[in-house]
């Protein structure tokens, strides 16, 4: 058997991992055989044997220490006091300090200045555990000016417990709110009336003796006052008055509204003086009716609204005679629109002017048409030229015709020199008159004297000059 090669250099990694006890089998005493156990190996043998018993621990790795050996200062973890973490408490600056009396955080035994929290009273700190020191929170024993005071009765505290404060805990003090014991001046509500010092001699409830101050009607010993509510006779001017002149609501007195115990003026009764309606006579139809002319409503003398005598509403003597054709109509002379005397509807002597059917009674009809005036024009009509008025007209008629021509040309949208029914309706509204569709149609056909279905400028101007 050939021996292995020389071992690796001492201290190398190969040497560290290859040093293992090797047992060589051979004859004792023979050359090359291993010595007996316990004898140190010869130098140069492999593996090299260390002094000591066989199987002893191998030497540690360089730079390492065996477990359990105390460490050198600066190592981690330090095993000696003064290191971090300290294993033996009580050294200054350590964390946590285990011995009392040393400054540190947190202190285990209270009472030291600057510690948190202070356990002994009398030291400034937060929060104090035993009250009574000024400036501590919360104060358990009330001091003047503190909030909230625990013991009442000190000035300026809240809530005050003594009189004059808000809310008072002991009732019956003047000015307190609410007073718990009645009978104090200014108390609310008074429970038992205080006798008026200015009251006349006598027991409450007697005539001439006023009730106690602050008493409410209906309490024992409180007499009913004059004008009390309900059911008593009130003084003059009380509310509600019972039968006094001018009161509201009065009960049967002259001038009352409404009179309860008088003849009623509506309808047909003879009213009292000052009743409503104030005129003598019924409403409607009696003398002095409302409004105050003699005659009924409508159609009598002095009717409403104020027509001439014997005129109905509007413009009738009575029902069935000339309903809309009288000269005494409600629409008076020249009213609608801009008519000459005796004309109501433009240019007519009847209430409805141009081409209208006037009811005479019920059933009979009559027609009245517009008569166009005859004017002499010097030149033929031209839509592109300015309108030429007839010869020999007064200035005010000329002015009306020029205004009508200007309005006509505004609504002649197609510059044809004629107006359709729709354009004519807009023109009438432009001039400030508003008719129904049927009225506008009748007026249109009354002006259209040539039956062309449209209005020429001269037809319209001639009609307007008559208004």
From Swiss-Prot:
Keywords attached to this Swiss-Prot or TrEMBL record, sorted alphabetically, are: Calcium, Metal-binding, Repeat
- Locate the motif XYPPX: 45-49, 75-79, 83-87, 94-98, 104-108, 115-119, 125-129, 136-140, 146-150, 157-161, 165-169, 176-180, 187-191, 221-225, 238-242, 247-251, 256-260, 275-279
Q: Does the keyword Calcium apply?
A: yes
What positions does the entry give for Ca(2+) binding?
412, 414, 416, 418, 423
- Gene3D superfamilies according to UniProt: EF-hand (1.10.238.10)
Keyword set includes Calcium: yes
Q: Offer an example of a GO molecular function term for this protein.
A: calcium ion binding
**Region annotation (Disordered) ranges:** 1-311
Q: Where do Pro residues bias regions lie?
A: 1-10, 45-62, 75-109, 118-131
Pfam families, alphabetized: EF-hand_7
Low complexity biased stretches: 63-74, 132-145, 153-193, 215-246, 253-311
Domain EF-hand: start-end pairs: 399-434, 435-467
Listed name of the protein = Calcium-binding protein P
| Organism this protein belongs to | Dictyostelium discoideum (Social amoeba)
Gene this chain is encoded by: cbpP
């Amino acid at each position: 058997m050939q021996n292995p090669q020389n071992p690796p250099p001492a201290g190398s990694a190969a040497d560290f991992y290859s040093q293992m006890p090797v047992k060589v089998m051979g004859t004792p005493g023979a050359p090359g055989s291993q010595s007996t156990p316990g004898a140190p190996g010869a130098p140069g043998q492999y593996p090299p044997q260390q002094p000591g018993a066989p199987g002893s621990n191998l030497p540690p790795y360089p730079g390492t220490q065996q477990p359990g050996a105390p460490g050198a200062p600066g190592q981690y973890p330090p095993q000696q006091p003064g290191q971090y973490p300290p294993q033996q408490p009580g050294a200054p600056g350590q964390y946590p300090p285990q011995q009392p009396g040393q400054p540190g955080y947190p202190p285990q035994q209270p009472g030291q200045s600057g510690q948190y929290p202070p356990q002994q009273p009398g030291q400034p700190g937060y929060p104090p555990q035993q009250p009574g020191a000024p400036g501590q929170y919360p104060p358990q024993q009330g001091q003047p000016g503190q909030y909230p005071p625990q013991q009442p009765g000190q000035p300026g505290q809240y809530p005050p417990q003594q009189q004059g404060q808000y809310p008072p805990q002991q009732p019956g003090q003047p000015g307190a709110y609410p007073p718990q014991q009645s009978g104090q001046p200014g108390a609310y509500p008074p429970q038992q009336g205080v006798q008026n010092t200015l009251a006349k001699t006598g027991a409450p409830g007697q005539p001439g003796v006023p009730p106690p101050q602050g008493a409410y009607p209906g309490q024992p010993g409180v007499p009913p006052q004059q004008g009390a509510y309900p059911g008593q006779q009130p003084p003059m001017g009380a509310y509600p008055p019972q039968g006094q002149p001018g009161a509201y609501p009065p009960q049967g007195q002259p001038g009352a509204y409404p009179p309860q115990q008088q003849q009623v003026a509506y309808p047909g009764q003879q009213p009292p003086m000052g009743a409503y309606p104030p005129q003598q006579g019924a409403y409607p139809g009696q003398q002095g009716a409302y409004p105050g002319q003699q005659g009924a409503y409508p159609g009598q003398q002095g009717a409403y609204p104020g027509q001439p005598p014997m005129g109905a509403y509007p413009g009738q003597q009575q029902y069935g005679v000339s309903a809309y054709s009288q000269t005494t109509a409600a629409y008076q002379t020249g009213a609608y629109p801009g008519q000459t005397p005796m004309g109501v509807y433009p240019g007519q002597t009847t209430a409805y002017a141009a081409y209208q059917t006037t009811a005479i009674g019920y059933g009979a009809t009559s027609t009245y048409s517009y008569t166009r005036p005859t004017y002499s024009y010097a030149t033929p009509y031209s839509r592109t030229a300015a309108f030429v008025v007839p010869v020999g007209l007064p200035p005010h008629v000329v002015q009306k015709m020029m205004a009508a021509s200007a309005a006509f040309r505004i609504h002649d949208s197609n510059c044809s020199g004629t107006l359709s029914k729709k354009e004519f309706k807009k023109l009438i509204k432009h001039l400030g008159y508003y008719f129904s569709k049927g009225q506008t149609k009748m007026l249109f056909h009354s002006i259209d004297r040539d039956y062309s279905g449209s209005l020429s400028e001269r037809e319209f101007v001639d009609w307007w000059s008559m208004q």
